[in-house]
Structures are given as C-alpha cells and as structure tokens.
C-alpha cells in the first residue's frame, strides 16, 4: 500500500524519505509527497539455540507499545537464496515492518541475520534506525541446547551444529566490526 503513489499511481520501493520533520515520502516519478512514520526496528539475532524464542516469549508479556515478530513466520523455500544473501527475504521483512510502523508502533524482529543483510536492502531507507542485539552463548552450552531439542527440529545434526557454532563465533568476533555495530548479550546462564 505505501509503495503506490497516491499522486500518480506508480509503484516504487525507492521513494525519497525527507530528513525534516514531519518525515515525508516523495514519489520519484511525480514528486508527490505524503506523511510517513519512520520508526526504528530492533533486530534480535543469534544462532539457533541462543535464546531468541525464550526472549521473544518473555518480551510478549511487556509488548503494549511495540510489535514482536519472528522472521520464520514468512519463511518458505522461495526465499532460500544464499547466493544473494537472502536479499528478497530481508527486503520483504523490511517492507512488512515499514507498513506496521505506519500504525505508530516500532517492531522487534527475532531471527538469525546480520546487519549487512538488512542495511543493503532498498526498503531500509524507510526505517529511522535499526538496532541490533546479538544473543550469544558459550559453544558448549549452545551445543547442549541444540542436541537436547526435539528430534523433529534436526537441530542436533552434525551439519547444523557446526553451522550454528560457526555463526555464534562469528557474532562474538564481529559484533563490534559490523555497521552498525551489534550489542552482544551472553545467554549462557
């Protein structure tokens, strides 16, 4: 809905967003301007088993002024495109968040991701800021959690364990190097 220009009817995800208040979205085709809420997004990332679901469920009890979402609710095989760093999936989420923001509520989005995956999306321009919190834990604890999960989740397979341990390590080593930086939260205990 917000990608269609009320002035000329053109569809674009590349509207210019003004920096002055009130924020306006400007159609590149006809220069029509409309008011636009540009709110922050809070991304909670981490390897499987790092505590994202537990944190989300605990946060739900306090969620009156923000919306909590899990990125997995939109996942399907059509988004499985590692060759482009899952760009369509990430951009779809930013479009969803942009639309939710128009109701005046910021979003807390849970799911495994890196700042680069969101910051490089065209829909990123519509968000005032993205804050990244990375949940991490000690490798032995992460492995224990994944192995103890129900078998149907296939979390304890050797391949999955290695992928999650590697991602957890990457987050720990790179949180201060990403742009923007990620805040680390150790969930070991």
Where are these regions (language model features)?
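Short cysteine-rich clusters marking metal-coordination/redox-active sites
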Residues: 5-8, 27-30
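Cys/His-rich microdomains that often coordinate metals
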Residues: 9-12, 34
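Hydrophobic anchor at the beta1->P-loop junction of P-loop NTPases
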Residues: 44
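Conserved glycine(s) of the Walker
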Residues: 51
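Conserved substrate/cofactor phosphate-moiety recognition/catalytic segment
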Residues: 56-98
């Amino acid at each position: 809905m917000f990608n269609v220009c009320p002035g000329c009817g053109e569809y674009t995800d590349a509207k210019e967003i003004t920096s002055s208040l009130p924020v306006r979205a400007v159609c590149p085709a006809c220069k029509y301007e409309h008011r636009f809420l540009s709110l922050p997004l809070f991304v909670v990332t981490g390897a499987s088993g790092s505590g994202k679901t537990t944190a989300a469920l605990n946060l739900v009890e306090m969620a009156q002024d923000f919306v909590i979402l899990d990125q997995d609710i939109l996942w399907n095989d059509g988004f499985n495109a590692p060759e482009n760093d899952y760009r369509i999936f990430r951009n779809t989420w930013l479009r969803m968040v942009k639309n939710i923001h128009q109701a005046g509520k910021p979003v807390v989005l849970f799911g495994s991701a890196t700042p680069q995956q969101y910051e490089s999306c065209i829909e990123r321009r519509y968000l005032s800021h993205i804050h990244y919190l990375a949940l991490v834990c000690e490798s032995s604890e992460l492995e224990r959690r994944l192995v103890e999960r129900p078998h149907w989740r296939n979390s304890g397979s050797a391949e999955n364990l290695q992928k999650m341990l590697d991602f957890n390590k990457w987050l720990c080593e790179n949180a201060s190097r990403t742009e923007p930086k990620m805040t680390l939260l150790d969930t070991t205990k």
